[in-house]
Amino acid sequence: MASNLIVARGGVEFVPPVSLAFWRWTTVFVLLIPFFYKPILKKIKIFKDEFFKLFFLGLTGCGICGAFPFIAGQTTTVVNMAVIYTSSPIFIILLSSFIYKEKINLIQILGLILCLFGVFSIISKGNISILSNLDFTVGDIWMLGAAISWALYSIYLLNWKSKFDLITRFVLIAMFGSISLFPFYLF
């Protein structure tokens, strides 16, 4: 994630944000498809059955989570991006509770508090006054969207059992991520 945020902040000066995301996932797909097209073709019926689920995973995990941090990097700081993106576990727990009616337990709450404390400690280098100087921008809203999208991707990936093996499913998710980004790449 750290390298993604650095590229998001620095790379957008040279390449438009959606282009970065589109070419990232298109490259992944193009490099992997020669090795995985046969299993996909053999399971074309499964592909058709799982089409919308795969598209949703590609949209949330590659499309939104791929483009939104790069868009955010145009107007916010890496520190803000890191702080906001670390909220993903909170959204995972809350959305899992809402969508799948999972109970939130004390250990999860303590884990989230410790996680956030650790992140804030690292970001502030132990100087809590740095956190009080955070200035929020429109880029932070884009990052919040990425964090929520990552949470949705994570809980659906965990709870949806595919008939494709993990790597083949990843290739298909990358493909749908590229497809979901393509119309925005054109503009």
Q: How would you name each of these model-derived features?
A:
Residues 1-22, 132-159, 179-183:
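Glycine-/small-residue-enriched transmembrane alpha-helix faces in small-molecule transporters
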Residues 1-5, 33-85, 121:
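Specific transmembrane alpha-helical segments of multi-pass solute transporters/efflux pumps
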Residues 6-17, 44, 71-74, 78, ...:
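Membrane-interface helix termini and inter-helical loops of multi-pass transporters
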Residues 11, 20, 24, 72, ...:
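Hydrophobic/aromatic residues within transmembrane alpha-helices
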Residues 21-23, 62, 66, 79-87, ...:
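Helix-helix packing/entry segments at the starts of transmembrane helices
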Residues 31-40, 88-113:
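C-terminal transmembrane-helix exit sites in multi-pass transporters
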Residues 32, 104-126, 175, 181:
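Hydrophobic transmembrane alpha-helices of multi-pass small-molecule transport proteins
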Residues 53-58, 82, 112, 139-147, ...:
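Residue-level signature of transmembrane alpha-helical cores of multipass secondary-active transporters
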